[in-house]
Amino acid sequence: MAQFEWVHAAWLALAIVLEIIANVFLKFSDGFRRKIFGLLSLAAVLAAFSALSQAVKGIDLSVAYALWGGFGIAATLAAGWILFGQRLNRKGWIGLVLLLAGMIMVKLA
């Protein structure tokens, strides 16, 4: 692996934020009925993967992808709660805890 630098962590953080934005735009697109939000979602996904590609220059792919996916899911869940009133049931909370535990395990491996 290449030497870790904070710039790679910044790229990863940007990739996570862009993924969340893409998911919110996807919800706003209403199944691509509102095309502008659908196109914005696609652009945000493209930008997220571009940022992730920069992050993996200094972070192991398995770690970067696990963190990107895990934090993206957790933050999208929070965005759904705040913006759309979506709530998790007990199984959903258990799944989120397991997801976070898995991210920690991958990072420590």
Swiss-Prot record:
Entry-linked InterPro entries: Small_drug/metabolite_transptr, Small_multidrug_res, Spermidine_export_MdtI
A Pfam cross-reference name: Multi_Drug_Res
Residues in compartment: Periplasmic: 1-5, 57-63, 109
Keyword Transcription regulation included in the entry's annotation: no
Transmembrane intervals: 6-26, 36-56, 64-84, 88-108
Keywords linked to the UniProt accession: Cell inner membrane, Cell membrane, Membrane, Transmembrane, Transmembrane helix, Transport
Keyword Membrane: yes
MF terms (GO), sorted A to Z: amino-acid betaine transmembrane transporter activity; antiporter activity; choline transmembrane transporter activity; spermidine transmembrane transporter activity
Native organism taxonomy: Bacteria, Pseudomonadati, Pseudomonadota, Gammaproteobacteria, Enterobacterales
Membrane topology: Multi-pass membrane protein
Name this protein carries in UniProt: Spermidine export protein MdtI
Domain of life: Bacteria
Places the protein is found: Cell inner membrane
Recorded family membership: Belongs to the drug/metabolite transporter (DMT) superfamily. Small multidrug resistance (SMR) (TC 2.A.7.1) family. MdtI subfamily.
Chief location: membrane
UniProt organism field: Escherichia coli O6:H1 (strain CFT073 / ATCC 700928 / UPEC)
GO cellular component: plasma membrane
Gene3D superfamilies attached to this UniProt entry: 1.10.3730.20
Cytoplasmic side of membrane: 27-35, 85-87
